[in-house]
Amino acid sequence: MSRNIVIKGAKVNNLKNIDLTIPRDKLVVLTGLSGSGKSSLAFDTLYAEGHRRFVESLSSYARMFLGQMDKPEVDLIEGLSPAISIDQKTTSKNPRSTVGTVTEIYDYLRLLYARVGVPHCPVCGKEIKQQSLDQIVDRILALPEGTRFMVLSPVVRAQKGMHEKVFADARRSGFARVRVDGNMYDLTEEIALDKNIKHTIDIIVDRLVIRGDIRARLSDSVESALKVSDGRVTVLVVDRDGEGEELEFSQKYACEEHGISFPELEPRMFSFNNPIGACPECAGIGNMQRISVKKLIPNKSLTLRDGGIAVNGFKTLTEDSWTGPLIAAVGKDFGFTLDTPLSEFSEEAMDALMYGAGARRYSVTRYFGGTGKDQTTTFDGIVRMIEKRMRMAGGDYYQEFVEEVACPRCRGRRLSDMVLGVTVGGLNIDEICSLSIEKMLAFVESLTFGEEETKIAKEILKEIKARLNFLISVGLDYLNLSRTAGTLSGGEAQRIRLATQIGSALTGVLYILDEPSIGLHQRDNGKLIGTLKNLRDLGNSVIVVEHDEDTMLAADFIVDVGPGAGIHGGKIVAAGTPEEVKKCEKSITGAYLSGRKAIAVPTERRRGSGEFLRIRGAEENNLKKLDVDIPLGTFTAVTGVSGSGKSSLINSILYRTLARDLNRAITYPGKVESITGLEHLDKVIAIDQSPIGRTPRSNPATYTGLFTDIRNLFASTRDAKAKGYDAGRFSFNVRGGRCEACEGDGVKCIEMNFLPDVYVKCDVCKGKRYNRDTLDVKYKGKSIYDVLEMSVEEGITFFDGLPSLKRKLQTLFDVGLGYIKIGQSSTTLSGGEAQRVKLATELSKRSTGKTIYILDEPTTGLHSEDVSKLIAILQRLADGGNTVVVIEHNLDLIKTADYIIDLGPEGGDGGGTLVATGTPEEVARCEKSYTGAFLREKLGLS
């Protein structure tokens, strides 16, 4: 096999026909400015082709289920292995997906509990023993005299299939009837089952009535049932209505005192995704949705007449509305009127308003469309009325008023009481999953068993320990297995999948990772690099898109893509060992690695306006009654190891409180006693890396408001006025000026059954999105299509005499986006580019000097050169008197902040406290701070 991966003529996106040779079975870092073409090379070329070749080798039937990728624009790739991509975007939002299920540790735990678990009665907690035939018969005979019942043999429990053999075996054994999914059938008739649905089948062994002379017959029937279903029997007690309760018995396990039988323990019983083990109330989700009174009443100072209830249908409650007269009548009984502020409602009155007035009836005149209707009716309460509407009309609108609460039956534990009664080492499966990874490893290592159980558990424990160690090696020791996958950050989810891949121990694979260091503190970087090297040493090629200096220096080979971004990028600037790249004069990466270039430390720090945002008693997630002050008018960095509580403090508490109180948004802040100092601010703006739009129609021009100015400009031209065109004519989102053949998209989607959908340029407008009449309207000789195809840099020159347009374009240029097209589809922008479009939009607005900007890891996806530009923008915002709060791990950005709030000292349970505050120099001197230790070196204080 070739010792290199050879790429020739790569032309995907902005790649300029590049040729590149990458060594196989090495740790290779692809780096370069944001938008330089790194992802195009790594994911759209190498991964796409590696995955495509693998999928192409499968049958056409298999390809239907495997989403095939386009063949990338590349002349040749040699030495390519099957590719696995580990990026940030594929985090499961399924509430059933947890850290335990994603890493497969939960599967091994289920096996462990099924094989060596000790069952306990869920009522009394006593250890459960096996039942004998005589004990089972005695229990049945204890039923009241005259009770009619059936003896059933449970042969299939919630299993897919047609189960023809089960029916055939039952016929051969002389049985006459079966119960399938609760329905009775004669075995003489043909029973056709859907093989894709789970079925439960019981053979009816006997029908009996409790009398004094049935012991012998009952004993024979029970014995027959036990024999057929491997030690289990069900007794269906039939009452006169045909309904009845079921009693389950097992020769395996049962609590004699409470008559509770356990089936034989098997792994699927411990799965919350299987109906056998899942909590019957919440079906294994662990929580339930209900209407939140807190969300219905965001502002308690309002009255019912003034819109105190935030839901449509209840916002305007007056005497001449439909619901108003009824609520006013209820108010007479409970001491409120439509003009009583909700904050003054008694507990009883609020309960009646929300959950109803019981059986009381009210005679009222209700109005609809100005017409009155006399009615005598009960009042169900606003919550119940909304629930009824949700059932009848679907609940999309009402979702914003719904909250998730722990299931009242399982209390969020997802499993049935019976399953939670099984323990290993004194803990049930939920309790062990609630431990942090670090504590769970210590617990697993301390387990001791008898001789036989030790033999059974040995291999299972070995797999569990290995996977827990892999999670610790990627810096995730603070997580627990019951954490839902949807609540993980992109970096955490990526590192979990990385740990899972190491656990699978594949060799000869091409792994492509997208910035695995995101969200990771410098302290844990060494662990991550060790993990990447471990993956390489198994015999794999590891290609990492990364900007982290430590990772680059630890790599075997660096590829620097550039030299600039967008149209100025797409070339290979340098390729070689870290030492070779350092020496390359053309490489910006080399300049930063060698120290020729560096981000400067400010000569002085802002002291701020003298006012503070004072947060008191923050207790969200792992925060431990935290008190912290944020100086206004400064650039503040919030730091700490992963899981220390940064996002809980800033995103869940601070941002949501500010958005609610300053922006009047409907948000629900995390647990905090108080936040004061809001009177010194006028609004809060969160700038993240989420896309600026989800469709190809969205672009930087539409997001920044530039497109409105451009359309107005074209509508004001002589040509447009002569034809009677207004600004709407120049929109590709509405009929009129757009090309109707492609509906303004510029491309058409051709569906291909066994191949990926193909997008072809519209043959009518040739990809220009507008019809010919619209394109005939020119400004300075350019059509609207020509303007949207210009780069921001070209646009500044073109619109030189138009201050409003030029200002918006200039801010895009200032944030380093001079290379992107004015009308470039938002779906093609990277996270870093999308964030800078948002920053540019803010910079182009007139500053009030009283705004607070909140950014969560803004350096994600940014090269050191881009970080330098980002810092300049943030400093510019702070220079205007605004407050900038940034959650960050990047030391280059942290060292330029005016003030640092360092949380920790560890992640998870070991975090949530204030470790250090002050200027970077002050935090660097704090011995307890991990951030301070790394800052000392950056600031040259060590």
Labelled PLM ranges:
Residues M1-S942:
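Conserved phosphate-binding elements of NTP-dependent enzyme cores
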